[in-house]
């Protein structure tokens, strides 16, 4: 070993390279032979660890060092003595970390180690450590850190007793006796009682009498887990006043139904209805006639929809509520058997009474719903028509409900009923207008496919069976196209469907967006879209790839699907979404790593040369523009990664005066070419981030560039105007709401003709039912107490509907998007309730606890899992802490260089141990992997999982949160038991 090697360098290398223990032991032995490691150096370099690691990387280093030190200590008697002799010299918190890890090793891995070493640890070294540490505490009042260390010393000893590591009672007897006498001296009576309970079969009666003491213990309540049963029972729903119980029941109905609307759980009507009945209908009423269940279901869904509208829920959520009411509720009601004995308990009466029970604030919402920019409708009328069309009510019933409605007569109802009963045969229509069409001679417009798709939302509005037929037809066609590789026909289908957001919503409502996403991700990942060198239509083929990308992004954007935690190896689609849509290339750099090799430098040089060629072609007037050879020089997937980088750099160059704006606009004109239009999604989103993050005005460069992109695509007069307009319409569907929000935040935007033009163009091309509102917190309200607002919002949920404010909508969205904060507030309120019994606090705890449970459990398997997990109070949840990309420290490597566009694989080696990076991608398709990873996300990245981490971290009785988390664990377990699924 080189003379320059020190323990510091050895440990640093071990941590950086993640050396195996065997390798480290060999190197350490060599070092120790040449120069004996001194105690001070051992403590500093081996034992001392980072407290409260700031990020995931620091935490991994800390865990690695702890395990390394323990493994080293168990390698020989000399190292064991060195470890225990020095452990007491480091911080008390550090000692606790080592005892926790040793405890786990003792429970699950002790058989791996030499029995004589383990005997020596228990009989000599641990006993000596106990004597040294506990005797050093003296007679003063113990600090929190000292109590914590004493707790873990006892917990480690109890593990020795429970697992009878060496099956030698005499050996364990000595350990227990030494520890018990010192606990008595420190007046830690709860810990002493705990130890004696664990060791009652080991100590003699004389020893127990000698150590048994009922003297006053110091802070007795904080030394061991406190029984929280009485407090937990006082928190139950049954302890609420009758008025508060009614508030609780009405609110959780909304939370339960709204979760269905957000999570696409529409597949099983019978299951939805059964769950509703078991969760919300009193058990004594469940076997009565169906009048009550019909009344409660109709009332709950209409009130829920009204609350969602009042709180400005996402546009797709509002559509899902409406579609569920119109198409699913009639199907559910059709399964009920109304006995025509009592005229007061008919379906008609149930509907009427449900309508009459709705608050005025909800009725006001239901009667003034907008469809499109001008049409106003009453959802109650639409629902009655659906009941008539589904033969649950006679046509004359409409006038009974709405006698003052003159436009919708019985003749109108009968006419619409006849149309409803007409057989659409959607698969045959798609065959006629897509499958059997010769694309070489018939354009998309001439085929009638666009016209068909645009007519379908109205044709399918009332029909559950037709919507299912549509979803099955489209999904089947996508599967068939993947097999036959008919890119052009799939392109036509996607253009026709994705340019109509309402039709897309119907599709994903009835087949789940993840199913559709999986099919499209599979398609694009398995296809390279290569063309022959002499293919003159190669730009068309390239555009097919772009439309697939836009379709995927359109679904995740419009339906708020977060794929940022998913990482599938070799998936171009997920790599593109994460790096070029979510992150907008922000995690890429032009810096070459210091440790780069010759191959890395060659790759970077090739990238720079390619970038220069494209910049010259796009922005240099002296060139002939984009040549076919340049376009074909790289794959279309690489082009879609390169173009956003090119334009970001060109815009940056313009902002610092390196190129003129006129030159930039010449390059922007190329973005109206059909195969390049899909790249504008990333460019526009990047521009919007520039507008939002920097103080901009109407004359700022990002606003000007955005205006040029929008105008050049909308006003294009090329031969493919129809096609390019459809492609850009999908872009507008994706970015349009964000464009309007960002531009309207600019001061005096109304005075800018440029901004008004963009707003007008975008608005004209957006479906008005899918324009998201700006729900950011008003600047005048930026100082509000978020925690208090969360509490108030849940407790006063129904009352707020009478006088809604922007803050209510903001908090409603905040709770939906930031459930972690709800958990933090819940913990604070449970702590507060222990000190002051408050009715408002109690109902909030019940509502927030229900929200935690209901948002985390999607299936019977989930319920069994979490019931079992929380039932075992000693379980640790730290292993389930989700690893997100945002938690990772940035590592400088070629994977983060701009030249990574040459890589079709999405993940480098640095991501291989990510929880959601599945290594079986070679065996399974991206779509199948996506479904598997989504299951993992749902299980390990929910509020119960997050609480479980907090619970495990606060099992130390000295923790200020100890009593709180145990009380809340009981409450959550009770709510899990009560949840029927």
Swiss-Prot record:
Entry keyword set: Activator, Nucleus, Transcription, Transcription regulation
Disulfide bond annotation, renumbered to this chain: none
Ranges that cross the membrane: none
One GO MF term attached to the UniProt entry: transcription coregulator activity
GO terms for cellular component: mediator complex
GO BP, one annotated term: regulation of transcription by RNA polymerase II
Domain of life of the organism encoding this protein: Eukaryota
Compartments (UniProt record): Nucleus
Family of this protein: Belongs to the Mediator complex subunit 5 family.
Subunit structure: Component of the Mediator complex.
Function: Component of the Mediator complex, a coactivator involved in the regulated transcription of nearly all RNA polymerase II-dependent genes. Mediator functions as a bridge to convey information from gene-specific regulatory proteins to the basal RNA polymerase II transcription machinery. Mediator is recruited to promoters by direct interactions with regulatory proteins and serves as a scaffold for the assembly of a functional preinitiation complex with RNA polymerase II and the general transcription factors.
Protein name in UniProt: Mediator of RNA polymerase II transcription subunit 5
